[in-house]
């Protein structure tokens, strides 16, 4: 399983004792975690501004991810120009899932599959992982 992480997921995983960070740490044993320079740069800028003491840990975590090229190409979905590099990155990285918390820009696509990439929230992704037996409900 290949999972592309949006910038807001990378940022959220930077919080101390984050349940999301714990989930992603466990998930690394079952999946390839991906991002691209576009998401990485946005997340790092936000961590540096809002959680500067976590910047080193954030960089360490992101260094464990597979970095896919930032590419832009035409898509058959309605998406803001600023969000195209995220979905295009997930597609270019052959991700099975794009995990994002961006309800404003991706909300209309939640649960949909675009070019073999299913766009999900963290909660939706947890359901997928539970159904696949990768994690247990707790």
What is each stretch, according to the model?
Residues 9-10, 39, 86, 104-105, ...:
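Alpha-helix capping/helix-boundary segments
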Residues 36, 104-138:
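Acidic, PIN/NYN-like endoribonuclease modules and their adjacent C-terminal/linker elements
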Residues 76-83, 103-106:
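Acidic, metal-coordinating catalytic cores used for nucleic-acid/nucleotide bond scission
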Residues 1-35:
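Short, well-structured N-terminal submotif of metal-dependent ribonuclease cores
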Residues 81-98:
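Acidic, metal-associated active-site segment
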Residues 10-13, 73-79:
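Short, flexible loop segments at the rims of nucleotide/cofactor-binding pockets, characterized by
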Residues 26-33, 37-77:
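PIN-domain endoribonuclease scaffold, especially VapC-family toxins
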């Amino acid at each position: 399983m290949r999972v592309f992480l949006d910038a807001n997921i990378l940022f959220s995983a930077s919080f101390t004792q984050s349940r999301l960070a714990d989930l992603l740490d466990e998930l690394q044993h079952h999946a390839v975690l991906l991002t691209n320079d576009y998401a990485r740069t946005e997340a790092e800028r936000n961590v540096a501004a809002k959680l500067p003491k976590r910047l080193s840990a954030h960089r360490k975590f992101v260094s464990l991810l597979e970095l896919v090229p930032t590419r832009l190409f035409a898509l058959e979905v309605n998406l803001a120009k600023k969000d195209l590099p995220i979905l295009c990155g997930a597609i270019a990285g052959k991700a099975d899932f794009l995990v994002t918390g961006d309800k404003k820009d991706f909300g209309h696509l939640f649960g949909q599959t675009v070019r073999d990439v299913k766009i999900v929230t963290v909660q939706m992704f947890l359901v997928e992982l539970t159904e696949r037996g990768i994690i247990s409900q707790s």
